[in-house]
């Protein structure tokens, strides 16, 4: 997945990675069904990959890293990306500079009644993708090229 919001730290005695996915994003459908997820980094020289992944929805362009080889992603293949799977069955691109695999420990949407500032209220008032859900994953594997 391509994320703009996230963090890494320690929670419940575990190394944890937190990601946020808006309710109308295609990725959310997969996150809600998944037991594991991967987050990848790419070299700066691969900015075309990041731009593509951050702007093209899997709804419109079947990205194989979310759907497996049954739905090949022609654009990702044209970018030179190849899908592989972890021992847990979680997809990732072999060209990633770093892959972090997480097991989901917690998932819930933000509840507006708990917003303590006007910043999220203002943002969501004009945000067509809907409110975000927070996913906290225990880091179970990490690979670096």
Task: Specify the residue positions occupied by each region the protein language model found.
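Active-site-proximal mixed secondary-structure blocks
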Residues: 1-145
């Amino acid at each position: 997945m391509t994320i703009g919001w996230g963090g890494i730290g320690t929670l419940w005695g575990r190394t944890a990675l937190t990601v946020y996915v808006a309710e109308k994003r295609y990725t959310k459908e997969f996150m809600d069904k998944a037991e594991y997820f991967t987050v990848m980094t790419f070299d700066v020289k691969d900015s075309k990959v990041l731009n593509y992944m951050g702007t093209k929805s899997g709804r419109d362009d079947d990205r194989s890293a979310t759907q497996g080889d049954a739905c090949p992603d022609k654009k990702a293949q044209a970018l030179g990306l190849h899908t592989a799977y972890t021992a847990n069955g979680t997809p990732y691109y072999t060209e990633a500079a770093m892959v972090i695999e997480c097991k989901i420990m917690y998932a819930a949407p933000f509840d507006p009644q708990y917003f303590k500032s006007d910043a999220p209220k203002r943002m969501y008032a004009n945000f067509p993708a809907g409110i975000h859900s927070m996913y906290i994953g225990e880091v179970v594997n990490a690979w670096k090229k």
